[in-house]
């Protein structure tokens, strides 16, 4: 199969991003992730398969509409007390409710698309990439959780002279990362915690493979621009020892940068849309600590 014909499951294409790589970029979000971080801002990305979601803030209300319940052939969507209710155990994934919904309250996260389809959308903004040094960033979920599709996207983008970056959690076979780095222009790599037991308790996997993979990048792709990022999560890795320990293991080179990211809850509403509970309810970032931490991190840049 030609690279441009390869297909994968994508849940969002976001244009005009300026925070996920150099210049103005188009972000392509792929479904699936080997980690299950309770602070994840894209919970709809974690499972590989498409997922049905309901956003009540966009609903026209059962009194005005109710088309989703009428369209559902299994009774998974119903009207109870004037409210739209969803029984996931009865849902067969036919998406009749989604097609019937006029407001977008009923939706599906995840759609099968080809490399050609994705890059056609990416290329629409080619003039912005040229002027800003931007391009394509693969994200997720995990950008390499669908390795065949992701690698085909990167190779085909390279043929079309599109600057490429991936955002990655680093947990997959080293050979996959090696293949990606051979065609990447830059890499954004998360390191959340050096303590493997603590990492596994929080995310579901240990940190050994992640650290092995970033070590592989440092050794075999020494000139690749790399941004290492750590989300600072209260109660998980919010100590000077944790963050400075990660910074210490990163080579001090001009092409390697490090960022500690402040915890936020911008993705919290989506947990409700998916029928899940947000486990960090009420948790807030310590702004004073982050300010002190960033002052300390600046000393590594000298």
From Swiss-Prot:
One of its GO terms (biological process) is alkanesulfonate catabolic process. It comes from the Bacteria. Its EC number is 1.97.1.-. The keyword GTP-binding does not apply. [4Fe-4S] cluster 2 binds at residues 59, 65, 68, 101. It is an enzyme of class 1 (oxidoreductase). Involved in the degradation of the organosulfur compound 2(S)-dihydroxypropanesulfonate (DHPS). Catalyzes activation of the (2S)-3-sulfopropanediol sulfolyase HpsG under anaerobic conditions by generation of an organic free radical on a glycine residue. This is (2S)-3-sulfopropanediol sulfolyase activating enzyme. S-adenosyl-L-methionine binds at residues 39-41, 141, 190-192. Pathway: Organosulfur degradation; alkanesulfonate degradation. The keyword Iron-sulfur applies. InterPro entries: 4Fe4S_Fe-S-bd, 4Fe4S_Fe_S_CS, Aldolase_TIM, BssD/PflA/YjjW, Organic_radical-activating, Organic_radical_activase, Radical_activat_CS, rSAM. [4Fe-4S] cluster 3 binds at residues 72, 91, 94, 97. It catalyses: glycyl-[protein] + reduced [flavodoxin] + S-adenosyl-L-methionine = glycin-2-yl radical-[protein] + semiquinone [flavodoxin] + 5'-deoxyadenosine + L-methionine + H(+). Residues 19-301 form the Radical SAM core domain. [4Fe-4S] cluster 1 binds at residues 33, 37, 40. It comes from Bilophila wadsworthia (strain 3_1_6). Residues 50-81, 82-111 form the 4Fe-4S ferredoxin-type domain. PANTHER family: PYRUVATE FORMATE-LYASE 2-ACTIVATING ENZYME (PTHR30352:SF4), PYRUVATE FORMATE-LYASE-ACTIVATING ENZYME (PTHR30352). GO terms for molecular function: 4 iron, 4 sulfur cluster binding; metal ion binding; oxidoreductase activity. Binds 3 [4Fe-4S] clusters. One cluster is coordinated with 3 cysteines and an exchangeable S-adenosyl-L-methionine. Belongs to the organic radical-activating enzymes family.
């Amino acid at each position: 199969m030609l690279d441009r014909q390869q297909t994968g499951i994508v849940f969002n294409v976001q244009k005009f991003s300026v925070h996920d790589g150099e210049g103005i970029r188009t972000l392509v979000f792929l479904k699936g992730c080997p980690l299950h971080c309770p602070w994840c801002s894209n919970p709809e990305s974690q499972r590989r398969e498409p997922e049905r979601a309901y956003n009540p803030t966009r609903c026209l209300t059962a009194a005005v509409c109710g088309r989703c319940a009428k369209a559902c052939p299994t009774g998974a969507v119903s009207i109870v007390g004037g409210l739209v209710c969803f029984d996931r155990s009865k849902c067969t994934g036919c998406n009749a409710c989604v097609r019937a919904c006029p407001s977008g309250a009923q939706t599906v996260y995840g759609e099968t698309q080809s490399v050609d389809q994705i890059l056609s959308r990416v290329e629409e903004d080619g003039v912005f990439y040229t002027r800003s040094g931007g391009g394509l960033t693969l994200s997720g979920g995990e950008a390499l959780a669908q390795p065949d599709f992701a690698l085909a996207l990167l190779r085909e983008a390279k043929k079309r002279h599109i600057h490429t970056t991936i955002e990655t959690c680093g947990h997959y076979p080293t050979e996959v990362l090696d293949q990606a780095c051979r065609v990447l222009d830059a890499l954004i790599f998360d390191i959340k915690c050096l303590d493997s037991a603590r990492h596994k308790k929080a995310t579901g996997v240990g940190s050994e493979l992640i650290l092995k993979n970033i070590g592989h990048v440092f050794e075999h792709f020494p000139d690749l621009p790399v941004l290492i990022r750590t989300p600072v999560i209260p109660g998980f890795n919010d100590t000077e020892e944790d963050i400075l320990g990660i910074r210490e293991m990163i080579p001090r080179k001009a092409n390697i940068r490090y960022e500690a990211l402040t915890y936020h809850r911008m993705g919290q509403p989506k947990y409700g849309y998916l029928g899940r509970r947000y486990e960090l309810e009420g948790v807030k970032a310590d702004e004073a600590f982050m300010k002190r931490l960033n002052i300390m991190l600046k000393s590594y840049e000298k």
